[in-house]
């Protein structure tokens, strides 16, 4: 199994790849230093900050007993083993810290980076234990089920016959803006599972995959239970703890932040706007737009409703605009915190208030919006944890590896390595196609065409002054001839390209197969393709393989794995 590391700054081929902020955050540059200083509290590349974070967390108090009871109850329900319950028990000690990651619920666990996040949290916790043996570090996976964007959660994709096939589970008796977690599956889920399995090739691992999906995805089960039980089964031999934030007991632990948000509104929004301005001054784009109140109200049907703050002394709940005095609303929140749900601005604050978060494992998009929250963390009186980039992979199947072999043969020069071919594929695939086709066998032909066009323009331009003296009416004819000559050369160039393309049609088709496999729908593979496509082919031990690979590398680089 071959692996290659690519720096994020070189990955430019996907339509929606890695943002400038993320590329700077994972680099070693002056831009990174400025970004860290302005937008974060800790730098994961600085050893001194690790001791500082231990001290910061050690000085805070957490509701550890309540947290252990909550997590034990939840994880037992999801199918936890004795290993998971032992990990949870460690949280009773003030010398136990959490390595937190999480993801929006997804169909059959959603895109494969969900798995990469969990693996990164497990590996990072293990590394910190090795560095600080007197402490414990437990990986916690936050189940983001309070989101009401059902359409985003209810889809996934796999490869089938060199094409990307999408699956989407239609909602069953679902109300508008209802939280995804408690959305139930109808009869349609059984048909979706069977169609998904039908498109997976027959392998020695298909029986295990089929049994798992049928066991957890069935009519009447909720989205969160299906997702959580699947994750627990996949990580049954790993010390990963799952956390559902929609639990009423967790809401009780979060209530102080809810009350602070309401009583100080719109302060947190002003903080995000101010931090966003700082971010934009550094040349980055702000991802998140805060609301006046960064909480939703949750009604008895599980629908998230926007909260407005029309005056200093009142709140209202949309869409009915039910009005409360400030005192009434704060009292409602204190008595019934389960009726409130944080939005994207407040969610990380809740996380790091309730949990002893030593580090948060985040993806490129999350790191971008967390860069907007520094002032808000300070507003709520807590420090930001370490923000660690999640592990990032592209899995290359043998048939795609063979295409890389062919590319190396066709365009490789003495000293060109396989890694450089991947650099070319991930850096500028369109240019690689041109190089592969070669515009015939003459690599200088493109330059010659450009030189020819330039020389013709120059020669015709030199005629201009003389023709003007002879007869000014000749000038338009000269101008038209200049345009026409350029078109003639371009026509010859296009025909040459087409002739060369026909000659290399087979290679271009293979490159297209590789493009589909590496950048399905123009996206990084990890953001679209589902883990069970690969588990069906390579078995659940693939998760252990990826964990071992991640253990051997830092997460500041993208890892290409030839399976």
Swiss-Prot record:
Coiled-coil residue windows? 498-518
User: What is the name of this protein?
Assistant: Putative cysteine ligase BshC
Record gene name: bshC
The record's family statement is:
Belongs to the BshC family.
Q: Which UniProt keywords apply?
A: Coiled coil, Ligase
Sorted alphabetically, which Pfam families does this protein's record hold? CC_BshC, Rossmann-like_BshC
EC assignment: the record states 6.-.-.-
Q: Where is the signal peptide?
A: none
A GO molecular function assigned to this protein is:
ligase activity
């Amino acid at each position: 199994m071959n692996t290659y590391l690519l720096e994020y700054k070189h990955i430019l081929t996907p339509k929606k790849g890695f943002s400038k902020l993320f590329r700077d955050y994972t680099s070693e540059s002056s831009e990174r230093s400025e970004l860290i200083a302005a937008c974060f509290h800790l730098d994961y590349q600085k050893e001194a900050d690790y001791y500082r974070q231990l001290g910061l967390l050690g000085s805070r108090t957490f509701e550890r007993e309540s947290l252990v009871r909550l997590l034990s109850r939840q994880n037992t329900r999801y199918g936890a083993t004795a290993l998971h319950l032992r990990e949870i028990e460690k949280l009773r000690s003030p010398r136990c810290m959490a390595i937190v990651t999480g993801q929006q619920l997804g169909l059959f666990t959603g895109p494969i980076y969900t798995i990469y996040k969990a693996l990164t949290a497990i590996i990072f916790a293990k590394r910190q234990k090795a560095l600080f043996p007197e402490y414990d570090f437990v990986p916690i996976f936050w189940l983001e089920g309070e989101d009401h964007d059902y359409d985003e959660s209810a889809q996934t994709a796999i490869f089938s016959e060199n094409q990307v096939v999408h699956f989407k589970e239609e909602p069953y008796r679902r109300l508008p803006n209802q939280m995804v977690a408690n959305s139930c599956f109808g009869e349609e889920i059984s048909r979706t599972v069977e169609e998904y399995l039908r498109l997976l090739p027959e392998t020695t691992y298909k029986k295990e995959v089929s049994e798992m999906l049928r066991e957890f995805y069935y009519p009447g089960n909720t989205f969160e239970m299906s997702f959580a039980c699947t994750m627990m089964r996949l990580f049954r031999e790993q010390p990963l703890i799952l956390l559902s934030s929609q639990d009423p007991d967790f809401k009780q632990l979060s209530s102080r932040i809810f009350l602070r948000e309401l009583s100080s509104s719109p302060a947190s929004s002003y903080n995000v706007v101010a931090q966003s301005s700082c971010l934009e001054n550094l040349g980055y784009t702000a991802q998140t737009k805060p609301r006046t109140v960064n909480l939703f109200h949750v009604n008895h049907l599980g629908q998230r409703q926007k909260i407005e703050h029309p005056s200093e002394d009142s709140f209202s709940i949309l869409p009915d605009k039910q009005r409360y005095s400030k005192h009434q609303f704060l009292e409602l929140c204190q008595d019934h915190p389960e009726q409130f749900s944080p939005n994207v601005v407040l969610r990380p604050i809740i996380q790091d208030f309730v949990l002893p978060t030593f580090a948060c494992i985040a993806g490129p998009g999350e790191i971008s919006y967390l860069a907007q929250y520094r002032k808000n963390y300070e507003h709520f009186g807590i420090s930001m944890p370490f923000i660690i980039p999640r592990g990032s992979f592209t899995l290359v199947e043998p048939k795609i590896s063979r295409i890389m072999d062919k590319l190396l043969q066709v365009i490789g020069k003495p000293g060109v390595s396989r890694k450089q071919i991947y650099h070319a594929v991930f850096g500028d695939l369109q240019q690689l196609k041109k190089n592969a086709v070669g515009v015939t066998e003459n690599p200088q032909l493109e330059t010659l065409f450009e030189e020819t066009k330039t020389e013709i323009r120059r020669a015709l331009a030199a005629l201009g002054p003389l023709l003007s003296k002879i007869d000014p009416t000749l000038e338009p004819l000269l101008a038209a001839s200049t345009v026409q000559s350029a078109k003639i050369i371009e026509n010859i160039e296009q025909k040459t390209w087409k002739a060369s393309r026909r000659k290399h049609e087979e290679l271009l088709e293979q490159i297209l197969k590789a493009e589909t496999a590496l950048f399905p729908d123009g996206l990084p593979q990890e953001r679209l393709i589902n883990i069970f496509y690969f588990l069906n082919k390579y078995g659940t031990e693939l998760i252990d393989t990826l964990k071992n690979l991640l253990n051997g590398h830092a997460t500041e680089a993208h890892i290409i794995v030839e399976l």
